[in-house]
């Protein structure tokens, strides 16, 4: 995972430039249709902050995390919220979120760690919570 984080730290600007304006609202809305207005969402591996900002603009409570220090800086600036630097393996919340949005993020996990992280994600969800990955 360190190589992945190093890559994103070094190429964050190029990644943001190529993805921030991608039209993604149809997929985002499909996720949101299962949530109550104002629900709490974790943007798990938020990258540029594009989706965090979209969800906040739609009235949802959003917490955003990323393992890349550069993405944390960029996303915090773009969204106006305090994005936390955190590895997927460090998720320890219990029944905190109504939805977890893990768009193009947990695919970077080694297979050996995926089951553990999916279990942590399930534990972090409230009853009837949903995940997008």
Description of each model-found segment:
Residues 115-127:
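A short glycine-rich, Lys/Arg-flanked "PGG" loop and its adjoining helix->strand segment in the class I
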Residues 1-36, 38-47:
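Conserved class I S-adenosyl-L-methionine
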């Amino acid at each position: 995972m360190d190589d992945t984080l190093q890559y994103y730290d070094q190429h964050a600007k190029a990644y943001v430039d190529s993805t921030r304006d991608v039209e993604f609202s149809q997929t985002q809305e499909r996720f949101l249709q299962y949530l109550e207005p104002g629900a709490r969402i974790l943007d798990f591996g938020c990258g540029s902050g594009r989706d965090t900002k979209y969800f906040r603009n739609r009235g949802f409570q959003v917490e955003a995390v990323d393992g890349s220090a550069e993405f944390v800086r960029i996303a915090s600036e773009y969204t106006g919220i305090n994005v936390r630097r955190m590895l997927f393996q460090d998720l320890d919340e219990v029944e905190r979120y109504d939805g977890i949005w893990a768009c193009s993020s947990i695919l970077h996990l080694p297979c050996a760690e995926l089951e553990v992280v999916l279990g942590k994600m399930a534990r972090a969800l409230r009853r009837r919570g949903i995940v997008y990955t």
